[in-house]
Amino acid sequence: FTHKIETIGEMSCNPAIGGLGKGHLVREIDALDGVIGDVADKSGIQFRLLNRSRGPAVRGPRTQTDRSLYKKYMQEKLLNYCNLSVFSDPVIKFVFDKKSVKGFITHSGKLIKTSKLILTTGTFLNGLIHVGDNQTPAGRYNEKPTTGLSEQLKKFNFKIGRLKTGTPPRLDARTINFENLEEQCADDDPYFFSFLTKENLNKQVSCRMTYTNDEVHKIISKNLKRSAMYSGSI
């Protein structure tokens, strides 16, 4: 049960999979027959093995991802997965019998009975977006959060906390002079996430790097108090 089937696989924050401390987790999920590694490989547009010059223990596979392709392939995976039914009807309340969960009630008023329930919160459980001075309840940009479930869980002594992720502003490629930027190419021998992936499906795209200067630092320092991280909002 989810808010919208058409937003399954929407990448809430940065369009990348893996990285240092995370890439090996994606491969472990793949080893357990999870789908994220396969979908990441099919939608990857720049594969790099980070820390390649160092020992194997600190290397981290990462791919920059085509967001549209990732969503497309993830939906195809889930909507055709054996013994999995997907419904657009968010859960608004758990149903308990003493201390055991017995089901849930959906936004449309349906009572679904179950002996086991897996809550996949993502960024939606009491989600809150900070943009400068402004705060907006949201699961992700322009999507409503899930409210009420946290309060129920607190009554059963679940510890409820909040995790933070930062999303950099998006830049319009048409406004950038790439000739003045340092090119960072994809690896010639891509390190895939899934053990089943044999070849790359997409044209690889270079990243571009630039650097700050004193003027940029002045702008940051002048406006630092407006950042949610430094104003005390987070």
Stretches found by the model and what they are:
Residues 1-95, 108, 116, 120-140, ...:
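Conserved N-terminal/central alpha/beta ligand/cofactor-binding core
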Residues 100, 108-110:
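Short acidic/polar mixed-charge low-complexity motifs
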Residues 102, 115:
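Conserved acidic residues
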Residues 223-234:
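Active-site helix-to-loop segments that bind/position phosphate- or nucleotide-bearing substrates
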